[in-house]
Amino acid sequence: NIKDNIAPKGYFIGCCYDGNKIFEALKDSNIEFSDTHSEKIYSIDKKYDIDDFTFNPDNMDNIFGNTIDVYMESIGQIIPEYLVNFKFFRHYMEENGFKLVSPKVKGKYSNLLKQNNITEGFGDFEKVINNLPELAEQDKELQKGGYYNEAMNILKNTELNDDGTIKELGYEKLRLLSSFNNYFIFQKV
């Protein structure tokens, strides 16, 4: 559909979970995060039954139909989603006349698209999160008093009292959820 509906030199931009990261994380168990009142914030449950999610262009039986059930408290219901193998995705897009691009952005948002936030051509939210202190040095909006200063809270870890109870809940599980995401910019050639 996008092959027919995007003009030459037009863009296809998006964001979704990196299926390989989710696949690896779900090898041991499903993922769930609840707050200090035992209210579920999110969960990701494995619904597929494959042992390997490696992309092989000669045999793609393991690439399609790998469902996960995703619950987000803010949405209030379970939504089925599918694992996206980014090596397959790139291969498929290139076969259909698209190439991954990293636009040359100047000014305010240029730091987000720096090479140290990109993995194999895809924007990597995990790297953006890990690079937030560096980004904040250059972006006043991330600094104290800035419009996006609260985004820096995602770097806080849980603090415990001496008896091991939670003093202040950190953002490790939200950081994990965010780190599963990749963003991409394809241009039709």
Describe each PLM feature range:
Residues I22:
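Glycine/Thr-rich phosphate-binding loops of Rossmann-like dinucleotide-binding domains
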